[in-house]
């Protein structure tokens, strides 16, 4: 069931906490055959808008491998957040990883005592290849011998064709009719674990000019019909607030059907990102900077905001059940539950799956999303105990049904 869009201001923008080793820039935006981007190094785009480097999410360093260790991912970063992950399902287990490109155009991460991790495939095109990080946030593989005219070369592969959980200006989501491949944005399992989660943002396959969010293959949210250029509600609102031209583009030809967007400001620089979070919400963040001022806005879309009585409540829409109307909600609480705990069977895709399982069980009143795709639940008769003094700075968040607090 497609649900109408709801736009509400956010006071908090998601923060991706992680540990990053001491970083040494390579003083370049390009990686060539024979060069390596080692664990402690980074590429910097020409205008210093984006960097490419390894990092360890906090959750993996805290829970998965023990204190002082962690899983390493190759990521493109904006000023504050990762916007693309090259190896979301196959991290490096230590700091031995290094990124390189071979003469056939294959990006790969080599590591100690394990086979290489392929970031891009072999393109079977020997030539003058290189990989460059652009100021758009796109990481492109080019063959200079095929560009002609002394230009930078034809693009053979680009990270924009393989988005993770963020849509940047110029990225295209839709359908490649030639390769029969769909390009979409997929949520992470958690804010610190980049493996694919429960939600996916893409273009409506029916041909309508609208965006859909799916939850495990079922339509969860719809943007409603959008228009090209800047005449859509969201585009007009952002333009009015910050004097920014915000435009949507729907395009269809024999090769590809896609949606993309762009932003620009008359004076100064502007950046934007659409973030699909672990709850299936889209947070649209736009910021600008000039010689005299800086500012920004953040808007989120979600199907359940109108039901929530608390700004901190978890927003995941569920279908009504025999015991729940669909307007109840779980709220995060710092502390722990007493008695009647049990664990779910099998692995989950993060907090959304834990939420759904607890929702469908009429005796479940609280849950917790654990590392490694596990869920813990508490049944009726359990008691919540507030507590805020966890050792080592660990904060235990339990999601408690509003009627049970």
Q: How would you name each of these model-derived features?
A:
Residues 2-405:
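Beta-rich ligand-binding surfaces for carbohydrates and other polyanions
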